[in-house]
Curated annotation (Swiss-Prot):
UniProt source species: Mus musculus
Entries under Pfam families matching the protein: UPAR_LY6 (PF00021)
Name of the protein this chain belongs to: Lymphocyte antigen 6I
Domain UPAR/Ly6: 27-105
Disulfide bonds: C29-C53, C32-C41, C46-C74, C78-C98, C99-C104
Glycosylation sites: N95
Lipid moiety-binding residues (GPI-anchor amidated glycine): G112
Gene symbol of the encoding locus: Ly6i
Keyword Disulfide bond tagged: yes
Predominant location: membrane
Keywords, alphabetical: Cell membrane, Disulfide bond, Glycoprotein, GPI-anchor, Lipoprotein, Membrane, Signal
Length: 134
């Protein structure tokens, strides 16, 4: 086996390993509570190993004005319709959604997670490197 072929094999194995490796850090979620829809929420690492990113949106009447607020967080489980039963006011509407991908609880979909970006960059680098070695 010549040196060129060995290097190509090592690079290919390294690329496959990096692209298939499980995420080393925890789930990334946005976190904020009861903020206006226009407000951006900072991201944080979910402390639960099998946690869920949760997006909650509430619409209610306060001082004769309709208001909309959002909350973003991480939970060890996905809240469901049971959570809504604690609201006694019939003028309040609440939507809850759960997901298990990085930063998936945004109000407006983002351009993708940092893992997607890293994967694309790594794949591009690997392609260039393989072409250079051939």
């Amino acid at each position: 086996m010549d040196t060129s072929h060995a290097i190509k094999s090592c690079v290919l194995i390294l690329l496959v390993t990096l692209l298939c490796a499980e995420r080393a850090q925890g789930l990334e979620c946005y976190q904020c509570y009861g903020v206006p829809f226009e407000t951006s929420c900072p991201s944080f690492t979910c402390p639960y190993p099998d946690g869920f990113c949760v997006a909650q949106e509430e619409e209610f009447i306060a001082n004769s004005q309709r208001k909309k607020v959002k909350s973003r967080s991480c939970h060890p489980f996905c809240p469901d319709e049971i959570e809504k039963k604690f609201i006694l006011d019939p003028n309040t509407k609440m939507n809850i959604s759960c997901c298990q991908e990085d930063l998936c609880n945004a109000a407006v979909p983002t351009g993708g997670s940092s893992w997607t970006t890293a994967g694309v960059l790594l794949f591009s680098l690997g392609s260039v490197l393989l072409q250079t070695l051939m």
